[in-house]
C-alpha cells in the first residue's frame, strides 16, 4: 500500500476587531449542498457493492485476475417513479491508450497502457466517465540548505488540504427536561477513506459508544468506548475505517451527526453535526465551554485559538449552542478572558440567533499573558445580557489530541548533512499545564555527544535559535526531562511542526543529527502510548552502513500472537537520482540477528512515503522465539542497500506456542471483543455493555465467537446484540471415496490429506502453511475447504472457501445454484443453499444433463459439460473467450491456469501473440500477420 506523506494546510480567517462598540459578525459555516437522496443506491458486481459514479477494474478471481484494460462504471439511473438506481457498464480502455513516444515501450505491472522506461504512466482519459476520487499528494522537493525535512504551508495548495472536520456536541434543545449539561468537542481527520477522530468531553460519564448517523437518524457506524481506549482520561480515540463513497459525500456536505451514547440511555445524550472549519489547521489552544449554572442544560460552546505568525495576537473562533435572546435575531454577548477570577480582556459583540459562531482577535498579549496561556491559567467566558442572562465558561488549554508527537533525527536532515549511520529517536508529551516532557534515544554517533538542543528553523546558516538546552539531561545515550517554562509562542510552534531537535558531537559541532518534531496520526496501535520506539540505524546493520537515513518503530504482540508494527523513517530516497528524491522506497523486514541463517527473514511491507504500518498474523515459531529472546531485528531495505539500510533490535517477551490461533475444543479463540490493534475488552466494561450476551454462565462480548460447552467440537456460537446464535459446523463435500475422521476435527478429510497433515504437523509452525480467515477470525490449515462463518450473518452455506497454503490466501467462491424448470422448487433442508425440484418433477433438460454427466470424471463449467481430460479456453461474459487461460477437466475437477510468459532478450525485434511477447521470425509470412490483425477482438488482453 502506498503511503505518501500528506501535508494539510488551512488558513485562519479573522475579522478585524474594534472593542469600543458591539459588532455583528458573519456566521462561520461551510457551504452546504442539498441532500438529493436518503436511500443509498449503487451497483452490485462480482459480489461487491459500488456507489453511484464509482469506477473500478473488474476482478474475475483466480486464475483470471484483475482486468486492468477494462474499466467498469456504476452509471446513475432513475426509475419511472424517480427512485435512483445504478447500472454497470464496462468499457475496453486499451484503445484509449496514448501512443508512446519511444521506440521500446514497456508494460508496467498493474497497468493497461505501455509507457516509456522511466516515464510516469499516462493518465486514463476521463471523457466518458466522471471521477470524484481522493487526492494523493506528493512531497515537494525542498532543497533548503538549513532544514531539508522542513514542511510548510507553501508545499500544499489550500484546496488540497480540506480534510479536517469538527463537531460541537451538546444536549438536544427539543428534549425536555434535558438529560445532561455535558459538552464535547470532536475533531476529525480524513485520511483517504479512513476517518480518524478524537473526542474530548466534560460533564458526562458512563459512555458506551460513539454513534455516527445521517440527518434522518439512520445509524451509519458505531464505535465502542473502552476504558483502556485512549491516552487521556477525558478523550476518546478511534477510527472509522473504509468509508464508502456515499458516506464520504454525506461527510463533505455536513450531513453526518456524531453522538455520545451512555450505558444508562439507549438514545444519544449529546450530539452535533460534523462540519469543515478553517480554524482547525492552525488551532493550537482550545476550550470547552459549559454552563456555569448546573440547572442550565442543553447549551455549550467551543473555542479554537491560535497565535499570529509574528505578533503576539490571539485569534479565536467561538462555536456556541443554546444561547437565546429576548427579541429579534441578534443576541448581545460579553466575552471575557480571566486569570484567577480577574478579568484581563473583554469585548462586546452581537451574534445571530440562528448561527451562534463568530471570530475575534485579542491584540498584543503581554509576556505574562503568553505564559498564563501556555500553562492553562486563562479562562474564557461568554455571557448574555437581559432579564434572564446565560453564561458559560471553560479553561483554555493546549489542544488535546490522540496523535503522537515524535521525531526521527538523522544525519541527512542535519544543517550540514552527514552520513554516519547514527540515529536519534524522540517522543514528546505535552501536558495540560504546558509542561513539555521529552524522551530521546541517541545511538551510533561517530564521537561523543556534546549538546542536545530544541531549536527553531534558523534564519541563516550560521545563526541557530536555541529555545531549550537539554544537554544536562543526557546520560548514556538517553535524554529524559521536562521543560516547564515554555510560553504560548513556543507551544504554538511545537504544535505547528516548527521546532527541531539537534544533536551535536565532538566531530560535528553544528550537529550530526537533526529532526523535525511532527505529529504522528492516531493509528490504534496501543504500543505508542506504552513504550518508547525502537531506534533504526545504519550502524545496527551487519556490516554497518554509513547512511544519512534513520528511523524508529513501535512493535508489539497481542494475546493472539499477531504482530503489529508502525515504522517512521527519514532521509531515505535522498539519492542522486532526482526521480527517487521525493519519496522513500523501502521494504520493511523482520528477521533474526544471527548470521547462521541469513535467509530467514519475513517481508512485512514494501512502501512509499515516510511511514509504514500493518500487522502479521502468521509468524512462525522460530521468529516468535527470537522476539522472545531479543535476538530479532526489524529493518528497512532499499534499492541502494538491499540487505538493509537501517535496522533495530527488538525484544518482545512472549509465550506463543504456535504461529496462529485455531478454534479447538481446548482453546476458544476470542474471549473478548478486540479493540483496534488487539487489546482485550475489559471485563468490567462487559458487565456494563448492553449488547453483551450471557450464555452458559459466562458473559460474551458483542461480536465475539466461541465453541459452546455442550458441543465444543462441531458447533460455534456468536453474540450479536444480546442474542446468542449457535450453528452446527457444516462440512463441505469431499472429492474422495473414503473420507476419514480425525480425533481433533469435526469434519472428515480425505485419506491423502490426513497423511499430509500428519507429516506436516510438526513443521506447521515453521512453514506457516495456513491461512487466517478474517471473516470468523480463525486459523485454517493449508488445503482446508469450509463454509465461512461471517458474523453477524452466521454460517454462509452459499459459499465455499479454500486455504491456499503456498500463499496463505483465502479464496472464497459463491455456490452456483442450477437453473430449475419446475414451477415449485423446494429446499430439501432449511439450511440448504440451493433449491431443487421435487423428484417427481425433474425436467427433460435435467435428465439430459444427468446423462451427460454419467461419463467417468466429466466436469461442468458454466452451462457446458466437458469429458475427462478435455482442454478448453473458458468464456467469461462480457469479455469473451479468455485465450490466455486454459482449463482442464481432471477426474471431475476443473483446473484453470493462466499461460506463463518467459522474458525475451531479442530487443526491439519482438512481437506479441495472444498472451506473451516472442522474438520475431524473420521468415514470418505476411499473410499470417494480416490474419492475426483481422481476428483480434476488442476484448483481447
Curated annotation (Swiss-Prot):
Induction of its expression: By activin in the presence of de novo protein synthesis, and by gsc and not2.
Locate the CHRD domain: which residues?
A: 161-279, 281-401, 402-522, 528-655
Q: Describe, from its UniProt entry, the tissues in which this protein is expressed.
A: First expressed at stage 9.5 in the dorsal marginal zone. Localized to the dorsal lip of the blastopore (Spemann organizer) during early gastrulation, after which expression continues in tissues derived from the organizer. Expressed in the prechordal plate (head mesoderm) and notochord during early neurulation (stage 13), transiently in the forebrain, tailbud hinge and posterior notochord in the early tailbud (stage 26), the chordoneural hinge in the late tailbud (stage 33) and finally the tip of the tail in the tadpole (stage 42).
Stretch forming the signal peptide: 1-19
Principal subcellular localization: secreted
Q: Which residues are glycosylated?
A: 244, 350, 433, 735
Q: Give the VWFC domain ranges.
A: 41-117, 691-751, 769-838, 857-919
The name under which this protein is listed is: Chordin
The species this protein belongs to is Xenopus laevis (African clawed frog)
Give the taxonomic lineage as stored in the record. Answer: Eukaryota, Metazoa, Chordata, Craniata, Vertebrata
What gene does the UniProt entry assign to this protein? chrd
Amino acid at each position: 500500500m502506498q503511503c505518501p506523506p500528506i501535508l494539510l494546510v488551512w488558513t485562519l480567517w479573522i475579522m478585524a476587531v474594534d472593542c469600543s462598540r458591539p459588532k455583528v459578525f458573519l456566521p462561520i459555516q461551510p457551504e452546504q449542498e442539498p441532500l438529493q437522496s436518503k436511500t443509498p443506491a449503487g451497483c452490485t458486481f462480482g459480489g461487491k457493492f459500488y456507489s453511484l459514479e464509482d469506477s473500478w477494474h473488474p476482478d474475475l478471481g483466480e486464475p483470471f485476475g484483475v482486468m486492468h484494460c477494462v474499466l467498469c462504471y456504476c452509471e446513475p439511473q432513475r426509475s419511472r417513479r424517480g427512485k435512483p438506481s445504478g447500472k454497470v457498464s464496462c468499457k475496453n480502455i486499451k484503445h484509449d491508450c496514448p501512443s508512446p513516444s519511444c521506440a521500446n515501450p514497456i508494460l508496467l505491472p498493474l497497468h493497461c497502457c505501455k509507457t516509456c522506461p522511466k516515464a510516469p504512466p499516462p493518465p486514463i482519459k476521463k471523457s466518458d466517465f466522471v471521477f470524484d476520487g481522493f487526492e494523493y499528494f506528493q512531497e515537494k522537493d525542498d532543497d533548503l540548505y538549513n532544514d531539508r525535512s522542513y514542511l510548510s504551508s507553501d508545499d500544499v495548495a489550500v484546496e488540497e488540504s480540506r480534510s479536517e472536520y469538527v463537531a460541537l456536541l451538546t444536549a438536544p434543545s427539543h428534549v425536555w427536561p434535558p438529560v445532561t449539561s455535558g459538552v464535547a468537542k470532536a475533531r476529525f481527520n480524513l485520511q483517504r477513506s479512513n476517518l480518524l477522530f478524537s473526542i474530548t468531553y466534560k460533564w458526562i460519564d458512563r459512555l458506551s459508544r460513539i454513534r455516527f448517523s445521517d440527518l434522518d437518524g439512520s445509524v451509519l457506524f458505531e464505535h465502542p468506548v473502552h476504558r483502556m481506549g485512549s491516552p487521556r482520561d477525558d478523550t476518546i480515540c478511534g477510527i472509522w475505517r473504509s468509508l464508502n463513497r456515499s458516506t464520504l459525500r454525506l461527510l463533505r456536505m455536513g450531513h453526518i451527526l456524531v453522538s455520545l451514547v451512555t450505558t444508562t440511555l439507549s438514545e444519544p445524550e449529546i450530539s452535533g453535526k460534523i462540519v469543515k472549519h478553517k480554524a482547525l489547521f492552525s488551532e493550537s489552544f482550545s476550550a470547552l465551554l459549559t454552563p456555569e449554572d448546573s440547572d442550565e442544560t442543553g447549551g455549550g460552546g467551543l473555542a479554537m485559538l491560535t497565535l499570529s505568525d509574528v505578533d503576539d495576537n490571539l485569534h479565536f473562533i467561538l462555536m456556541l449552542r443554546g444561547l437565546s435572546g429576548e427579541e429579534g435575531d441578534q443576541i448581545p454577548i460579553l466575552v471575557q478572558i480571566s486569570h484567577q477570577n480577574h478579568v484581563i480582556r473583554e469585548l462586546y459583540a452581537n451574534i445571530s440567533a440562528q448561527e451562534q459562531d463568530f471570530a475575534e482577535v485579542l491584540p498584543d498579549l503581554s509576556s505574562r499573558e503568553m505564559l498564563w496561556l501556555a500553562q492553562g491559567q486563562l479562562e474564557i467566558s461568554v455571557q448574555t445580557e437581559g432579564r434572564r442572562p446565560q453564561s458559560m465558561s471553560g479553561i483554555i488549554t493546549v489542544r488535546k489530541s490522540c496523535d503522537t508527537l515524535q521525531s526521527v533525527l538523522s544525519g541527512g536532515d542535519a544543517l550540514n548533512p552527514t552520513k554516519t549511520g547514527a540515529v536519534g529517536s524522540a517522543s514528546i508529551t505535552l501536558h495540560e499545564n504546558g509542561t513539555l516532557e521529552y524522551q530521546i534515544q541517541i545511538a551510533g554517533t561517530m564521537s561523543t555527544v556534546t549538546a542536545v538542543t530544541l531549536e527553531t528553523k534558523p534564519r541563516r546558516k550560521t545563526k541557530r535559535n536555541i529555545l531549550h538546552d537539554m544537554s544536562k539531561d543526557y546520560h548514556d545515550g538517553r535524554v529524559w526531562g521536562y521543560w516547564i517554562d515554555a510560553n504560548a509562542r513556543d507551544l504554538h510552534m511545537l504544535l505547528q511542526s516548527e521546532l527541531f531537535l539537534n544533536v551535536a558531537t565532538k566531530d560535528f559541532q553544528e550537529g550530526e543529527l537533526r529532526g523535525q518534531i511532527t505529529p504522528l496520526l492516531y493509528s490504534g496501535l496501543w504500543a505508542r502510548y506504552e513504550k518508547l520506539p525502537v531506534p533504526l540505524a545504519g550502524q545496527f546493520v551487519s556490516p554497518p552502513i554509513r547512511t544519512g537515513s534513520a528511523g524508529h518503530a513501535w512493535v508489539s504482540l497481542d494475546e493472539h500472537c499477531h504482530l503489529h508494527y508502525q515504522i517512521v523513517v527519514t532521509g531515505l530516497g535522498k539519492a542522486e537520482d532526482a526521480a527517487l528524491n521525493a519519496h522513500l522506497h523501502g521494504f520493511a523486514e523482520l528477521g533474526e540477528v544471527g548470521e547462521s541463517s541469513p535467509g530467514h527473514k519475513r517481508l512485512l511491507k514494501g512502501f512509499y512515503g515516510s511511514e509504514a504500518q500493518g500487522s502479521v498474523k502468521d509468524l512462525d515459531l522460530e521468529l516468535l522465539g527470537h522476539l522472545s529472546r531479543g535476538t530479532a531485528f526489524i529493518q528497512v531495505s532499499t534499492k541502494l542497500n538491499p540487505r538493509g539500510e537501517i535496522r533495530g533490535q527488538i525484544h518482545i517477551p512472549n509465550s506463543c506456542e504456535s504461529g496462529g490461533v485455531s478454534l479447538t475444543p481446548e482453546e476458544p479463540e476470542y474471549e473478548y471483543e478486540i479493540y483496534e490493534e488487539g487489546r482485550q475488552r475489559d471485563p468490567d466494561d462487559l458487565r456494563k455493555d448492553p449488547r453483551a450476551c450471557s450464555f452458559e454462565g459466562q458473559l460474551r462480548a458483542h461480536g465475539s465467537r466461541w465453541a459452546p460447552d455442550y458441543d465444543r467440537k462441531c458447533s460455534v456460537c456468536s453474540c450479536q446484540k444480546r442474542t446468542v446464535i449457535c450453528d452446527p459446523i457444516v462440512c463441505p463435500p469431499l472429492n474422495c471415496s473414503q473420507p476419514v475422521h480425525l480425533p481433533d476435527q469435526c469434519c472428515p478429510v480425505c485419506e491423502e490429506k490426513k497423511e499430509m497433515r500428519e507429516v506436516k504437523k510438526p513443521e506447521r509452525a515453521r512453514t506457516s502453511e495456513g491461512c487466517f480467515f478474517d471473516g470468523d477470525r480463525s486459523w485454517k490449515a493449508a488445503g482446508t475447504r469450509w463454509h465461512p462463518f461471517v458474523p453477524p450473518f452466521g454460517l454462509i452455506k452459499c459459499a465455499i472457501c479454500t486455504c491456499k497454503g503456498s500463499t496463505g490466501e483465502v479464496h472464497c467462491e459463491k455456490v452456483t445454484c442450477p437453473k430449475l424448470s419446475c414451477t415449485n422448487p423446494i429446499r430439501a433442508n432449511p439450511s440448504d443453499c440451493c433449491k431443487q425440484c421435487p423428484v417427481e418433477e425433474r425436467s427433460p433438460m435435467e435428465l439430459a444433463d444427468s446423462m451427460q454427466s454419467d461419463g467417468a470424471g466429466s466436469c461442468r463449467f458454466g452451462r457446458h459439460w466437458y469429458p475427462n481430460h478435455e482442454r478448453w479456453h473458458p468464456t467469461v461474459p462480457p469479455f469473451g473467450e479468455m485465450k490466455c487461460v486454459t482449463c482442464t477437466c481432471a477426474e471431475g475437477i476443473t483446473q484453470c491456469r493462466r499461460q506463463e510468459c518467459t522474458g525475451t532478450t531479442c530487443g526491439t525485434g519482438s512481437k506479441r501473440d495472444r498472451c506473451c511477447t516472442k522474438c520475431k521470425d524473420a521468415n514470418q509470412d505476411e499473410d499470417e500477420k494480416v490474419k492475426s490483425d483481422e481476428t483480434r477482438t476488442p476484448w483481447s488482453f
